[in-house]
UniProtKB/Swiss-Prot annotation:
Binding-site list for S-adenosyl-L-methionine: 49, 67, 103
Organism of this sequence: Gallus gallus (Chicken)
Catalysed reactions, semicolon-separated: small RNA 3'-end nucleotide + S-adenosyl-L-methionine = small RNA 3'-end 2'-O-methylnucleotide + S-adenosyl-L-homocysteine + H(+)
Family: Belongs to the methyltransferase superfamily. HEN1 family.
Function, in words: Methyltransferase that adds a 2'-O-methyl group at the 3'-end of piRNAs, a class of 24 to 30 nucleotide RNAs that are generated by a Dicer-independent mechanism and are primarily derived from transposons and other repeated sequence elements. This probably protects the 3'-end of piRNAs from uridylation activity and subsequent degradation. Stabilization of piRNAs is essential for gametogenesis.
Protein name: Small RNA 2'-O-methyltransferase
Any one GO molecular-function label of the UniProt entry: O-methyltransferase activity
Residues binding Mg(2+): 121, 124-125, 171
Gene3D superfamilies: Vaccinia Virus protein VP39 (3.40.50.150)
């Protein structure tokens, strides 16, 4: 039994594993992992499943979907909204997801500047007049570095039970491999792209001559743009309606970066505090477990370690110390923590982010924590 095929051809039952739609989406995912585009647009995005899968690709910073049917997009677009976990642990990358309602036969400046444009099972739904305009909109106006177009291979239809004309009632046409490749090569030549052909949904053994169930053309621009198209190429008015936009929390936004830094600083400070107090307590005379005696024990440690505090502060020691009921943790000590260092980059930025968010000593060289609530 073939890897992508389950069932016997003679029974008239064909089942692809994974399902054919997943194979198409996984094909796009593999391209994204290989070429790492930052801006990706899916034309004919329908229920947004491909966009939902792509939002987990760490290289992508901008995702856009376009479909003629607003209702279909709205059914599942909630999956594109940030989750609580995205706010608790913001990503290092920025991510903006936008959905537009409109036709691929119309130009809109919101679709300029994309690295990759996908058209998965789209073109067979276009009217003849729309198909005529499609190449100019996608390859001429949008002009991304890469375009992926998939469409049914009509030669495979003889293996699909119940298919007499087209696979879907909304299909306006279905091409065989020669027809698709002729159209794709003409389009590629006209707009200075190269094109390679492949597909997903392998045929059963002995029927290889029909080709893949879904045929795919991968177009690559021969001379990638290094800057945005000039202003004169843009239409004066927007043609699409924006129906959804989500801006994901990112550490590139200083608000989220500050929250992450302060949270990590306080977590590390509490660990240092606990370690220091445990060390001081271990050096003192052993007492019973009576709470009062334990407090005396802590005070003994504090008093023993509080000598020459001012000298330590002036020298800006890199080690924490105790004065009275306060623990001083030098900021240099906290900044040396790898995660804090990675988040902030520089000590100056670190100090700026935590100022006003944590309690610092008079010369802002150390973070201050109270020992009073440590032993009750």
């Amino acid at each position: 039994m073939d890897k992508n095929f389950e069932g016997k051809q003679f029974t008239g039952v064909i089942k692809f594993t994974p399902p054919l739609y997943k194979q198409r989406y996984e094909f796009v995912q593999d391209l994204v992992r290989k070429y790492e585009p930052k801006k990706v647009a899916d034309l004919g995005c329908a229920d947004c499943t491909l966009l939902w899968m792509l939002k987990f690709c760490s290289c992508i910073e901008v995702l856009a979907g376009l479909d003629i049917c607003e209702t279909v997009m709205k059914e599942k677009m909630h999956r594109l909204t940030p989750l609580p976990a995205d706010y608790l642990e913001p990503s290092e990358r920025s991510l903006i997801v936008t959905l537009h309602q409109g036709s691929v036969a119309h130009k809109d400046p919101c679709m300029l500047g994309f690295d990759l444009v996908t058209c998965i099972e789209l073109i067979e739904h276009l009217q003849e007049s729309e198909l005529e305009k499609f190449p100019e909109v996608v390859f001429g106006f949008m002009a991304p570095n890469m375009v992926v177009i998939s469409t049914p291979n009509s030669e495979f239809n003889t293996l699909l039970p119940g298919v007499t004309v087209f696979r879907h009632p909304d299909h306006k046409f279905e091409w065989d491999r020669a027809q698709f490749q002729s159209w794709a090569q003409d389009t590629a030549e006209r707009y200075e792209y190269s094109v390679e052909f492949t597909g997903v949904g392998s045929p059963p053994t002995g029927m290889e001559d029909v080709g893949f169930c879904t045929q795919i053309g991968v177009f690559v621009k021969k001379y990638p743009q290094t800057r945005e198209p000039v202003q004169r190429e843009k239409p004066t008015e927007a043609a699409y309606k924006t129906v959804f936009k989500a801006v994901y929390p990112s550490l590139k936004d200083e608000k989220y970066l500050q929250n992450a830094v302060v949270s990590e600083v306080m977590f590390r400070a509490q660990l240092i505090k606990r370690s220091l107090l445990d060390h001081l307590l271990s050096e003192c005379e052993e007492y019973n477990d009576d709470p009062t005696e334990r407090k005396l024990k802590l005070q003994c440690s504090v008093n023993c370690f509080s000598e020459d505090v001012e000298t330590l502060a002036v020298e800006k020691s890199t080690e924490p110390f105790v004065s009275g009921n306060v623990i001083y943790i030098p900021l240099r000590k906290i900044f040396s923590v790898p995660k804090v260092n990675q988040l902030c980059g520089t000590f100056e930025k670190f100090c700026r982010l935590i100022t006003g968010k944590v309690t610092l000593n008079s010369d802002s060289s150390a973070l201050m924590l109270d020992t009073e609530n440590e032993e009750n």
